[in-house]
Amino acid sequence: ASSGTALTPDQIRLINRLTKNITVLFDGDAAGMRASLRGIDLILEAGMNVRVCTFPDGDDPDSFARKTPIDELQHYLKDNATDFIRFKANLLMKDAGNDPIKKADVIRDIVVSISKVPDHIQREVYVQECASIMDISEDVLFSTLAQIGKKELQEANKKFVQDKKMEVVKATPEETKEKVNIIY
């Protein structure tokens, strides 16, 4: 359960050792859910299958689990857990309303999450689902996915070059001569 604290990559790695499937549990607080969306992307990056379940207003995962018999709790989770695309679409579209610019931002946000999925087949299925839910063509989503991938690659290359430059700056004069092949 995401209990107001950020989910860390180390925690995700530990969970990933035990299972590839994770259900993130939220209370009904929309602001708290929006703040925790980054955790969903981290889970996706780890190659895990993520579902999301929210609880009725006034209940958080702990209070709901304490007052609900285990079989009812399992039934509730089974019936109410949804994939991350449907969850994000429902949550973020509440704010977007009929504003086309905000709707485009919601779609872009979902596609960024899809871009975190390492498995190409899963990614394609998620694109199909997003297209269906958001009523947009798959071609546009795939094009946006490609743009995101290209941008991330450019950023990774830029960071690599910057890191190499910093190695030269931090190096001793002898190491610097070696790295840039200067002969005195």
What are these regions (language model features)?
Residues 6-184:
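A charged alpha-helical hairpin associated with nucleic-acid processing machineries
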